[in-house]
Amino acid sequence: MSEEPRFDTVAKAAATPDLPQPYTELGMKDEEYARVREILGRRPTSAELAIYSVMWSEHCSYKSSKVHLRQFGEKAPDTDVLLVGIGENAGVVDVGDGYAVTFKIESHNHPSYVEPHQGAATGVGGIVRDILSMGARPVAVMDSLRFGPADAPDTQRVLPGVVSGISSYGNCLGLPNIGGEVGFDAGYASNPLVNALCVGVLKHENIKLAQASGPGNHVVLFGAATGPDGIGGASVLASASFDEESQAKRPSVQVGDPFLEKLLIECCMELYAKDLVVGIQDLGAAGVSCATTELAAGGTGGMRIELDRVPLRDPRLTPEEILMSESQERMMAIVEPDKLDEFLAVCAKWDILASVIGEVTDVTPEEEARGGRLVMTWRGETIVDLPPRTAADQGPVYHRPIERPADQDALLADDPAALPRPSSDEELRDQVLRVLAAPGICDSSWITDQYDRYVMGNTVLAMPHDSGMIRIAEDTDRGVALATDGNGRYTRLDPYVGTQLAYAEAYRNVAATGARPLAVTNCLNFGSPEDPGVMWQFAEATRGLADACQALGTPVTGGNVSFYNQTGSTAINPTPVIGVLGVIDDVHKRVTSAFSAEGESVVFLLGETRLELGGSAWADVIHGHLGGRPPQIDLDAEAALGRVLIDGAAAELLVSAHDLSDGGLAVALAESCLRGGVGCEVDLGDDAFTALFSESAARAVVSVRPEHETALVDLCAKHGVPVRRLGTVGGSALTMVHRTGRISIEVAELRDAYESTLPALFGNK
């Protein structure tokens, strides 16, 4: 009589239906566990429980957000640029000349607080593999960062680690970091936001999908060996709130190896070029559990896996640990039998470990409608036998309670228009410098200089300009521009309008460089979905983004939801970060945000300025105030301004263009002066304060040569965009004339205020 295995098997599960299981420790609710039992017709094995616990986690299943995210598809604009939409590892859009671009943004917030360097580094590695798994060569990365107060001890710990993690991983991969943003607010203390974006380029015919099709095809796991790092990351770190014990969660943070990922990229590109891959999936959150269930669910058959064949760094790992491990730099491919030897040879060439761990299986006629089975064995015994779609696609969907926060009306009524304003030109001058020097507005070179922005030689624009821009290939002048934006202050005041303002700012930033906005990705950072107030914010934010994208014809291609961004019961300000991608036909016609010191230039303000200070940088920096209504949103005005900027760039009318956002005209003028190393003199009109600090949307500052003034004014009239001549570029100072006075700040003084803040806080790099 053979000895009964010491591990949990399907046979043992059927024979011991009442055996207690630690499902609550794995983050599952009573009703979720009951549903698993109903699906299987028995209790799950411990390996099956591991799979369902991570695949049904908030991070992987979107169980609280799915009902709201559906409107991105339901309200999708009618466009022919979308080649692959929501549901795959990343969206893919047509950019012309037979080329496509894939891009996506994702969060690695919680791991980056627990272990800043590795958390941020593996965030970059994970999003790069998402892009790689679509069949594309990754060509650039970006990041959107939020931290607590810049002078707080915890920020002093977290920020340098996050920046070093992003820079070391991206630089080792040889990928330029072309842009992003950084913000500071007390609400992000102990809960930083680290959102990483990657963009890749491919030909239409080379798109790859996560699907396991073709019975008899091999399942190959390749890349790093599997270790204990990151076990339970999807459920432990990404699907629960922080508390005072968060540092104890350090073992759940993954460890990255960028040099191995670089080899993995080159290996995949050769595999794609030789047509050796049927389907492919990267291993990120939930590791082998996610890769096997999603590949099987996306295909036409089932899958049989021999878990013993998974290469291990630690031979002591249990089957459950192997399934939940989030070791980095791993991919899973479906390979036809007659191509297997060549596939393995390519992996060997790049020194990439590869192992055949299973095969695609056929389905019976009865199974065809609902898909095949995912069967896994360990030491010859079956430990998993489940319908993969139930784990990957059919997790719980919650209609969470929604309730407008009780303090929302009081917050809106607290109008910053009542705050004390500067009473003299000297005080106004001082406030311009204070806003310019604020940590979330000032020069971010302390951060961006640690990134290689120009490696690979195709970077056209990078920080500090309005968007990053990359030429897509050596044989074309076509390029893509990318910008990410988000403003938690606006979204706290009005999540619907605030999210549209974030989208509109990213849209303007892309248009300001001369690129046509095409598509959108998003990273939605919110507090606990179990809080009805947070769910109200989330519902309003998603509705706002869906409506805005529909209005301006830019489909949402995918993204990420990050819930539980809170410490105890204190949630962050809702922070949807919106990424907009645009295309420019000729990168030589790009427009920068810098005034030109060569020749004469005339400065114009495009768009309408109103007294709008709710959520503004002025109210925050000068008074520490958050209240009132955010700037109003007019999507028709945003579209019209975009057409002026894009057409003006194509006609080579514009010397510079810079959108107005945080800090209003004061910051925009100062930045254009600083980036060009030249001053300007402008007329602010009757109300200098409103002219300088209002944050009305749908505005930009542009400069043109004198001979193009009439053409610009005519172009604005054609599209119905208000236009006002402000002054001229020249001299060594930013000089602002108004009805009762004159303010002048030397460019050198602007530079000192703008560039000294972060080095003073964080030291020399």
UniProtKB/Swiss-Prot annotation:
It catalyses: N(2)-formyl-N(1)-(5-phospho-beta-D-ribosyl)glycinamide + L-glutamine + ATP + H2O = 2-formamido-N(1)-(5-O-phospho-beta-D-ribosyl)acetamidine + L-glutamate + ADP + phosphate + H(+). One of its GO terms (cellular component) is cytoplasm. It is found in: Cytoplasm. Pathway: Purine metabolism; IMP biosynthesis via de novo pathway; 5-amino-1-(5-phospho-D-ribosyl)imidazole from N(2)-formyl-N(1)-(5-phospho-D-ribosyl)glycinamide: step 1/2. Pfam families: AIRS (PF00586), AIRS_C (PF02769), FGAR-AT_linker (PF18072). Substrate binds at S107, H108, N109, H110, R129, Q254, E326, S327, Q328, S562. Mg(2+) 2 binds at D130, D282. CDD domains: PurL_repeat1, PurL_repeat2. The active site is at H59, H108 (proton acceptor). Mg(2+) 1 binds at E106, N560. InterPro entries: PRibForGlyAmidine_synth_PurL, PurL_linker, PurM-like_C_dom, PurM-like_C_sf, PurM-like_N, PurM-like_N_sf. Part of the phosphoribosylformylglycinamidine synthase complex involved in the purines biosynthetic pathway. Catalyzes the ATP-dependent conversion of formylglycinamide ribonucleotide (FGAR) and glutamine to yield formylglycinamidine ribonucleotide (FGAM) and glutamate. The FGAM synthase complex is composed of three subunits. PurQ produces an ammonia molecule by converting glutamine to glutamate. PurL transfers the ammonia molecule to FGAR to form FGAM in an ATP-dependent manner. Belongs to the FGAMS family. This is Phosphoribosylformylglycinamidine synthase subunit PurL.
